[in-house]
């Protein structure tokens, strides 16, 4: 009975991996096809990759996307870690629950609503849309992710560690830098990489706040097929 259950679990695990990775493998394989569609493989070619690396605009957009992701993730990690420490330090349950609820608003809100809200906010404050607006938006929706990653690690930490360090003469800065931060570092790294992933993956929020002359990789990838399909569907003048 145990062997049978083990085999079924392995089969289920393999099915999950196939569902997750088969589309990616499919895209990679057909990226080497000479054809322009993904119906049939028309022969091996490097042409698509040559065109990709020859596209200076796309390379610049890729670098901007990486820069946005790294900056927003780093700043969101710092702010989110401080926020998690602040939430954990509150003594009143009502205050703590209120702060957690406010933190989770961006997590449960639809991306379209968040993007439209940021657009209205930046327009009202006359903040130009571009690199700065995208960076601020990515920081804002990444902070709750970092808080949710760091806060459980803080709550796991025993207060006896802090009490012992304080009894040995450690000040507040030493408690933070030498005890708290090293202990919660796994949560900080998890929050950073989660924020980095969300920033690289985001499309809906970024689409609203990019403005003219600036784009990220996800927005560019979406807009190019739209432009091609629009051009093909436009009737020729007679």
What kind of feature is each model-predicted range?
Residues 1-5, 71-103, 120:
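Transmembrane-helix boundary motif in ABC transporter permease subunits
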Residues 1-56, 60-63, 67:
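N-terminal, non-cleaved signal-anchor transmembrane helix
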Residues 2-4, 67, 91-100, 157-190:
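Amphipathic cytosolic juxtamembrane alpha-helices at the membrane-cytosol interface
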Residues 3, 36, 48-57, 200-238:
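Interhelical loop and adjacent transmembrane-helix boundary motif
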Residues 11-12, 17-24, 147-150, 157-159, ...:
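Transmembrane alpha-helices
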Residues 22-25, 29, 78-82, 116, ...:
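Membrane-embedded alpha-helices of multi-pass transport/permease systems
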Residues 59, 63, 67-79, 83, ...:
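Hydrophobic alpha-helical transmembrane segments of multipass integral membrane proteins
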């Amino acid at each position: 009975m145990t062997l049978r259950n083990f085999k079924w679990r392995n089969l289920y695990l393999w099915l999950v991996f196939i569902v997750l990775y088969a589309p990616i493998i499919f895209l990679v394989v057909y990226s080497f096809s000479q054809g322009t569609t993904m119906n049939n493989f028309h022969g091996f070619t490097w042409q698509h990759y040559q065109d990709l690396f020859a596209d200076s605009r796309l390379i610049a957009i890729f670098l901007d996307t990486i820069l946005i992701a790294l900056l927003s993730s780093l700043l969101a990690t710092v702010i989110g870690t401080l926020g998690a420490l602040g939430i954990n330090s509150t003594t009143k349950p009502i205050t703590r629950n209120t702060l957690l609820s406010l933190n989770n608003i961006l997590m449960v809100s639809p991306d379209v609503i968040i993007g439209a809200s940021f657009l209205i906010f930046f327009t009202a404050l006359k903040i130009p849309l571009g690199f700065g607006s995208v960076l601020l938006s990515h920081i804002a929706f990444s902070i709750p992710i970092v808080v949710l990653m760091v806060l459980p690690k803080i709550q796991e930490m025993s207060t006896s560690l802090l009490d012992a360090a304080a009894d040995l003469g450690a000040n507040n800065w030493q408690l933070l830098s030498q005890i708290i931060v090293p202990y919660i570092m796994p949560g900080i790294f998890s929050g950073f990489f989660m924020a980095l992933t969300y920033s690289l993956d985001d499309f809906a929020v970024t689409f609203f706040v990019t403005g003219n002359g600036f784009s990220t990789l996800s927005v560019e990838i979406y807009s190019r097929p739209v432009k091609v399909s629009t051009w093909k569907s436009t009737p020729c003048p007679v």
